[in-house]
Amino acid sequence: MLDLGTGTGVLPRNMYSFGAKWTGTDISPEQIEQAKKLSPGMGIGYYAMPAEKIDFPDASFAAATACQCCWYFDHEKLIPQLCRMLKSNGRLLVLCMEWLPFEDKIAGMSEDLVLRYSPTGAVRARRCTR
């Protein structure tokens, strides 16, 4: 599992007990150092690098996550890299935990659009092609 924008490694640490091997990357060396301190003995690999410059071997990961950070990335550069690094049928999970509609007007309008075009909340997946 690859966690992009891992910050202090909250997601890998919380998912560690489920058995997957995690790797976290973040642009901030300070965040990565904190992640390492908070994850002793977990075997989580942390690397300070921009998401667009990750360069792991082909088919290294079954899945990649981006929690609360995807809007910072240059998608034109990142997505081809991820497609290369994900295994066949690999998945990218983008987590965006937005404000509730009554707390933020723009978030509410966004939710209205999502519900209009996907009333069941179903998500369309796209395949990476090589």
Stretch-by-stretch model annotation:
Residues 66-67, 75:
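A short beta-strand submotif of the Rossmann-like class I SAM-dependent methyltransferase core
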Residues 83-130:
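Conserved catalytic/acceptor-binding region of the Class I
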Residues 2-4, 8-53:
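Class I SAM-dependent methyltransferase SAM/SAH-binding core
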Residues 51-53, 71, 99:
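Active-site micro-motifs of SAM-dependent methyltransferase domains
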Residues 52-63:
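A short acidic, Gly/Pro-enriched loop at the edge of an enzyme's catalytic core
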Residues 73-82:
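A short, conserved alpha-helix within the catalytic core of class I
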